[in-house]
From Swiss-Prot:
Catalytic activity field: UMP + diphosphate = 5-phospho-alpha-D-ribose 1-diphosphate + uracil
Biological processes annotated in GO: UMP salvage; uracil salvage
Free-text cofactor note: Binds 1 Mg(2+) ion per subunit. The magnesium is bound as Mg-PRPP.
Gene name of this polypeptide: upp
Cofactor: Mg(2+)
Gene3D superfamilies assigned to the protein according to its UniProt record, in alphabetical order: 3.40.50.2020
Enzyme Commission (EC) number: 2.4.2.9
Binding site for 5-phospho-alpha-D-ribose 1-diphosphate: R79, R104, D131, P132, M133, L134, A135, T136, G137, G138, S139, D200
Purpose: Catalyzes the conversion of uracil and 5-phospho-alpha-D-ribose 1-diphosphate (PRPP) to UMP and diphosphate.
Listed pathway(s): Pyrimidine metabolism; UMP biosynthesis via salvage pathway; UMP from uracil: step 1/1
Name of the protein in question: Uracil phosphoribosyltransferase
Single GO MF annotation: uracil phosphoribosyltransferase activity
Enzyme class: transferase
Transmembrane region(s): none
Length: 209
């Protein structure tokens, strides 16, 4: 079963409180999501493999550690996932970026893929899928389905807030995908919104309604 990592780091929790705050404006909201994305990336990549390399300092030669040849890709779920992407790239600037676009079918209420663009050598990459919210889990599950169909093997999912229902659904659908969460919330309400949540992340990021 996939591991669920809920971050209690003081900086993450401090910034998340302002992200949740209704009065936080678009500019500050965007900056905070970027910052938390960067802080979370530090923890999400904690188990990346390192290789020994020989380097020369101004004083002497030594054996140092560098990331192994495994390639990393960040995949935001459009559109809200874009808000977390730059923060991750600040920590891993060499990472490639894929995109997955999903919309909800008005009749079935199921997510439908309308766009997907991935880096080459997909089988050789570690993927970090990012989306600010994990509510029912439908979008995350479909995005990961899309990656696996294209050959992805190692996938992690990273979000700001999650409902227990979404975590359970994602674990059931993809027990091999670890889940990284800044805030695990109480529940979904009758309309499928995370409670207490942070509102509509996409609208708050881009100043739309």
């Amino acid at each position: 079963m996939a591991k669920v990592h809920v971050f209690d780091h003081p900086l993450i929790q401090h910034k998340l409180s302002y992200i949740r705050e209704e009065s936080t404006g678009t500019k500050e909201f965007r900056e905070l999501v970027d910052e938390v994305g960067m802080l979370m990336a530090y923890e999400v990549t904690r188990d990346l493999e390192l290789d020994d390399v020989q380097i020369k300092t101004p004083v002497t030669e030594m054996t140092a550690k560098r990331l192994s040849g495994k390639k990393i890709a960040v995949v935001p779920i459009l559109r809200a996932g874009l808000g977390m992407t730059e923060g991750v790239l600040k920590m891993i600037p060499a990472a490639r970026v894929g995109h997955i676009g999903l919309y909800r079918d008005p009749e079935t209420l199921q997510p439908v893929e309308y766009f997907a663009k991935m880096p080459q050598d997909i089988e050789e990459r570690d993927f970090i899928v990012v989306d600010p919210m994990l509510a029912t889990g439908g979008s995350a599950i479909e995005a990961i389905n899309s990656l696996k169909k294209r050959g992805a093997v190692k996938i992690r999912f990273m979000c700001l807030v999650a409902a227990p229902e979404g975590v359970e659904a994602l674990q059931k659908a993809h027990p091999d995908v670890d889940i990284y969460i800044a805030g695990l919330d109480e529940k979904l309400n009758d309309h499928g919104y995370i409670v207490p949540g942070l509102g509509d992340a996409g609208d708050r990021l881009f100043g739309t309604k």
